[in-house]
């Protein structure tokens, strides 16, 4: 039997215009028109660690993610954590926590991330460099492992980043991955043995123009499956207290 799935993203597009203090802004300057400064930096060339940091450093992305998780705007966040959350002699995944949100020390939300790079070569053709689509299994192992460690809520997050200037025929917000590429990623992910308690999030980050994505871009977030909260282990709560006491929030 064929079951059709419908998922819904919430998105935000952003564009910036820089001018020195006191300068008059030219009223003819058009936002979302791709006329900003050209950068040779592509979002698809950033490391996974860099792009996870981008999620929390970039206001539209951070706000969307916190809203989907139903968390306050001032929630503590940190990326790429090992000590003190992961025991040094641990031999099973995860080796680190890609992203953590802590609204309360007794409610730590651990998120494991797998990024997928998509390059729009033409209006209708995508390219996914490397053998990325086969790496979802590792993401699920890490997210299931976070649950085993004892965090309150655990998520697998599939992050799809797209470099889309070649889709200039489309409007600013429509230059992301093609529906066909996303369907493949979605169904491969849903076929994985993710634990019933572990949630699933999809995030799309698109660089629609040749301007740096820090200044101009689009981000979309879909909470496909909310995590089921668990009783957080006392040991993890103690480690989380140690983390938030000694490390600054992002």
Task: Give the ranges of each region predicted by the language model.
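Acidic-basic catalytic patches of nuclease active cores, encompassing PD-(D/E)XK
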Residues: 2-96, 102-105, 117, 249-250
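Charged, low-complexity C-terminal accessory regions
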Residues: 28-32, 184-250
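Short connector loops at helix/strand junctions that flank enzyme active sites
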Residues: 94-96, 106-108, 141, 151
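Conserved catalytic cores of phosphodiester-cleaving nucleases, focusing on short active-site segments
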Residues: 99-101, 107-123, 146
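SAM-dependent methyltransferase catalytic-core segment centered on the flexible catalytic loop
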Residues: 121, 133-134
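Short, charged/polar, low-complexity loop and linker segments
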Residues: 126-127
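Nucleic-acid nuclease catalytic cores
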Residues: 134-211
């Amino acid at each position: 039997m064929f079951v059709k799935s419908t998922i819904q993203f919430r998105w935000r597009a952003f564009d910036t215009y820089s001018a020195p203090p006191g300068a008059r802004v030219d009223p003819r300057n058009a936002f979302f028109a791709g006329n900003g400064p050209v950068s040779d930096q592509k979002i698809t060339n950033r490391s996974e660690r860099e792009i996870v940091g981008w999620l929390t450093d970039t206001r539209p992305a951070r706000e969307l993610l916190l809203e989907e998780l139903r968390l306050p705007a001032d929630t503590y966040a940190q990326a790429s954590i090992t000590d003190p959350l992961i025991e040094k002699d641990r031999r099973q995944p995860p080796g680190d926590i890609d992203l953590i949100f802590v609204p309360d020390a007794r409610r730590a939300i651990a998120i494991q991330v797998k990024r997928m790079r998509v390059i729009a070569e033409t209006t209708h053709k995508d390219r996914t460099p490397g053998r990325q689509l086969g790496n979802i299994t590792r993401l699920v192992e890490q997210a299931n492992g976070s649950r085993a460690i004892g965090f309150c809520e655990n998520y697998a997050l599939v992050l799809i980043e797209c470099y889309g200037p070649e889709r200039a025929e489309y409007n600013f917000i429509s230059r992301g991955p093609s529906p066909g590429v996303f369907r493949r990623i979605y169904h491969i992910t849903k076929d994985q043995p993710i634990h019933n308690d572990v949630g699933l999030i999809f995030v799309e980050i698109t660089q629609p123009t040749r301007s740096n994505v820090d200044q101009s871009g689009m981000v979309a977030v879909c909470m496909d499956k909310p995590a089921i909260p668990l009783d957080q282990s006392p040991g993890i709560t103690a480690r989380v207290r140690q983390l938030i006491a000694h490390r600054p929030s992002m």
